[in-house]
Amino acid sequence: LKIAFDKVYFEMGKNSEGKYELILTPEGDRARLMLLHYWLQYAPQELWQKWNFYSSKPGKANSGWGMRMFGVDLVSEDVTLYAEPDNDKNKINLEVYSPKLMELDENQRYSMFFIFLDQFIGELYTMEYIGYIDFVENPSDKKGVRIEELQPMIDNNINSNGWPKFENPTEIYSGYRMEPTEKEGWTLREDIFSGYTSCTPLLNDFYNGESQRFDEAAENGVRFGFLFFENMNVPRENIVNFRGDIEDKIVAQTVPYGIANSLGGATGFHFSYIDFIIYDYDAFISIAKEILAGYDFDEVGYSDFK
């Protein structure tokens, strides 16, 4: 692991079947999860006979499972959930009734509950399918569910309501809209009015001028960046498909070879953008240059997010 990562959090043990397990955790960080998922894809095939590898904590706890933290002993019977599906956002919103958790201060309460929740539904389900979490002081008139019933409820929504099934963190997208700048002398991405992304925290960091995620990726040999090219001469009705065609060509020559993954794209009043997580920068730039050279762009380039 030290060869692959500058810093990584993991657990190691042996399961009931006698197989060793190496469990990495992104600690709830979606950008970090992408690096761990890439690592998982290249775990040596011959090791899988005796090992299980995970890029996030799996959910394995059953009814009656318990933990102790902050001086509180908590078992599944101590927690009642009032779950409300949100089909617009593909999330389950939770109200939590647990007198034992209410004994803790707010930060401790949320910290312990998230760790407890991960044990039952897995870290990925917590990240992808859990919306807001509120703690209530009294039982509700709503129908309550046990925490061990939550994962089947999520699976039912995936199957019945068409929620996206998590397989690759770079392939689950959400759309966004922005107000483009009206000032002169604007910089890259300030012209964007719509886009989609598989890693909203990265965009938030970019616009807020924060660099921790980008620095951490760089320490692990990974870059987050984007291609940009002018779109003013592209008919408005074709602008998204035009960007998509270029993205498809680059993806076809990079993703199968572990060079990069697309993270989404965006449309501005001057430029179109395609966002990437890049594992082999030199190979990626060579491929991108060759493909973009086939178009008659006056303005085209690459930029790191940082």
Which residues are covered by each model-predicted region?
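An N-terminal, globular interaction/scaffold subdomain
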Residues: 1-51
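Extended, low-complexity, amphipathic alpha-helical coiled-coil/linker regions that act as scaffolds
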Residues: 22, 35-40, 131, 139, ...
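Long, hydrophobic alpha/beta structural blocks
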Residues: 75-182, 199-209
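Eukaryote-biased, non-catalytic alpha-solenoid scaffold regions
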Residues: 10-15, 20, 26, 50-51, ...
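Short amphipathic beta-strand and strand-loop transition segments with alternating hydrophobic
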Residues: 9-14, 77-85, 215, 263-265
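Short, low-order "capping/linker" segments at domain edges
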Residues: 60-82
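C-terminal structured domains
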Residues: 46-52, 57, 178-306
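Short, glycine- and small/hydrophobic-rich beta-strand elements in well-ordered beta-sheets
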Residues: 3-12, 128-133, 251-269
